């Protein structure tokens, strides 16, 4: 009954089969037509799947056994910080006083929740070196957009509305130019130098009177620390622009150096990365934004403040860009992040970064004789290697990533950043053991050897997974997003087969 490819729950459906019987209704039946306008009433019976309770349980248990996550295997997905999420976080998030509270309750009834929000704001201010922090943004890109809208409001307030350009490095996350566009800015690219850092001369070339900001990650997406960050800040600030810190790589510098100390005016953090909020399955995430004093009056409202021994919402933010997320934001992630920060303490967070950097450099050192390493200096928490050596045997980085699946390892990020040919970005995080790192390294070395001696083994990978190579082109151009579309597609397949047989 269980096959490699699981049928959809709709395909398991059998008419009049059900999992649960409702008790007999002793309330008078009222026609829904008497309660709702006709336009809201379904014209046809909903096509819900009809399955037994046992089939229902088996279906979702089967699917869950096919999931892959940090709890099941190594997940070195570069720029994503797929670290272990401590289970104490889940215990705290399930405390009934938090999990059963309602965002519309009166302030005096949710003092505990407001205290968590306020306390987390204070912790993040200290960690980042910012003067104020809002927790509202729902994820990293939302945080980017929020910060850029603050920049935009600041420039407009100061008679600088002509500033419509945001500088992004050629190694930047794709969300950076996308967020700039959503905020109404144009993106201008600054090149990297031979060391993988921002090219200072090119920066001087692109900075002008229209520069609103520069968006940087430090360490950058190549895993390299921008040693000239103070000079970069001086160049942009003297031109009237602002510095924005993309917090995707904060895991490398905790309690070592703070964005505020590097001269950044705003920062977003990923609580679902650095601070162990789970981010598998698409979310929920959380992307708090911190700003320096001159931008504090532009933050989204309300803020949570402490008034003597009570916590309350503060809507008195004169230049606020307005609310960017309903109610508290993603409060459950706040709880997990706050638990993590308080559990680790300052020394623990410092050790996090030290171990993350050590692990990345250990892998890089052991792989340098088997793969092209574009940048030879010590990396921070991640690094990028190139598959150009393997390409001469007809094997690409994509093929090697597929082969890694046979070893029970989630592939690293591939073909990113864009300025490395056949790039593979590896971020092991601090939570992995040396034994796990060695297993991954040995797998990579074996794959490198196979590309020379048995390339077909790599080209035809994966060999052990439920699904092998996807037809990604067709999936992108002709996506099947609804069960009705799947039925239509299967009908076409059967029709074509019948035609060929005849």
UniProtKB/Swiss-Prot annotation:
GO molecular function, one term: glycine binding
UniProt xrefs under Pfam families: GcvP2_C, GDC-P
UniProt record, GO biological process: glycine decarboxylation via glycine cleavage system
EC number(s) reported in the record: 1.4.4.2
Cofactor: pyridoxal 5'-phosphate
Source domain of life: Bacteria
Database matches in InterPro entries: GcvPB, GDC-P_C, GDC-P_N, GDC_P, PyrdxlP-dep_Trfase, PyrdxlP-dep_Trfase_major, PyrdxlP-dep_Trfase_small
Residues the record lists as N6-(pyridoxal phosphate)lysine modifications: 273
Keywords for this protein: Oxidoreductase, Pyridoxal phosphate
Family: Belongs to the GcvP family. C-terminal subunit subfamily.
Subunit structure, as described in the record: The glycine cleavage system is composed of four proteins: P, T, L and H. In this organism, the P 'protein' is a heterodimer of two subunits.
NCBIfam families: PRK04366.1
Annotated protein name in UniProt: Probable glycine dehydrogenase (decarboxylating) subunit 2
Species of provenance: Staphylococcus epidermidis (strain ATCC 12228 / FDA PCI 1200)
UniProt lineage: Bacteria, Bacillati, Bacillota, Bacilli, Bacillales
């Amino acid at each position: 009954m269980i096959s490699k490819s699981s049928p959809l729950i709709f395909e398991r459906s059998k008419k009049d089969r059900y999992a649960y019987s409702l008790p007999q209704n002793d309330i008078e039946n009222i026609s829904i037509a008497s309660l709702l306008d006709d336009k809201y009433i379904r014209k046809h019976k909903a096509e819900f799947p009809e399955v037994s309770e046992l089939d229902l349980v088996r279906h979702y248990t089967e699917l869950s056994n096919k999931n892959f996550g940090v709890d099941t295997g190594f997940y070195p997905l570069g720029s994503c910080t797929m670290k272990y999420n401590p289970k104490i976080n889940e215990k705290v998030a399930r405390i009934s006083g938090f999990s059963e509270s309602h965002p519309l309750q009166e302030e005096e009834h949710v003092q505990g929740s407001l205290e968590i929000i306020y306390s987390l704001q204070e912790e993040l201010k200290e960690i980042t070196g910012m003067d104020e922090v809002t927790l509202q943004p729902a994820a990293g890109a939302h945080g980017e957009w929020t910060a850029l809208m603050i920049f935009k409001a600041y420039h407009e307030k100061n008679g600088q509305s002509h500033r419509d350009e945001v500088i992004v490095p050629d190694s930047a996350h794709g969300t950076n130019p996308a967020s700039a566009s959503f905020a109404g800015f144009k993106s201008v690219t600054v090149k990297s130098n031979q060391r993988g850092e921002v090219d200072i001369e090119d920066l001087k070339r692109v900075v002008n009177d229209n520069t609103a900001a520069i968006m940087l990650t430090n360490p950058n997406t190549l895993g390299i620390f921008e040693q000239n960050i103070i000079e970069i800040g001086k160049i942009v600030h003297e031109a009237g622009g602002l510095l924005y810190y993309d917090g995707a790589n904060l895991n490398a510098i905790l309690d070592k150096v703070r964005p505020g100390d590097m001269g950044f005016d705003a920062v977003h953090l990923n609580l679902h990365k650095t601070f162990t909020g789970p981010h598998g399955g698409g979310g929920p995430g959380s992307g708090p934004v911190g700003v320096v004093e001159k931008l504090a009056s532009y933050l989204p409202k309300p803020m949570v403040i402490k008034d003597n021994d009570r916590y309350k919402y503060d809507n008195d933010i004169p230049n606020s860009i307005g609310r960017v997320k309903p109610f508290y934001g993603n409060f459950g992630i706040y709880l997990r992040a706050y638990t993590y920060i308080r559990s680790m303490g300052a020394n623990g967070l410092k050790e996090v970064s030290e171990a993350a950097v050590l692990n990345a450099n250990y892998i890089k050192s052991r792989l340098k004789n088997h793969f092209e390493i574009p940048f030879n200096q010590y990396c921070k928490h991640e690094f990028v290697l190139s598959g150009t050596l393997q390409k001469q045997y007809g094997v690409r980085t994509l093929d090697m990533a597929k082969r890694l699946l046979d070893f029970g390892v989630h592939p690293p990020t591939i073909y990113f950043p864009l300025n490395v040919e056949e790039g593979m970005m590896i971020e092991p995080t601090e939570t992995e053991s040396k034994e796990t790192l060695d297993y991954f390294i040995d797998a990579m070395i074996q794959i490198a050897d196979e590309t020379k001696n048995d390339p077909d083994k790599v080209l035809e990978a994966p060999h052990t997974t439920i699904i092998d190579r996807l037809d990604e082109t067709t999936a992108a151009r002709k996506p099947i997003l609804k069960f009705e579309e799947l039925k239509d597609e299967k009908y076409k397949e059967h029709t074509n087969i019948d035609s060929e047989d005849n």
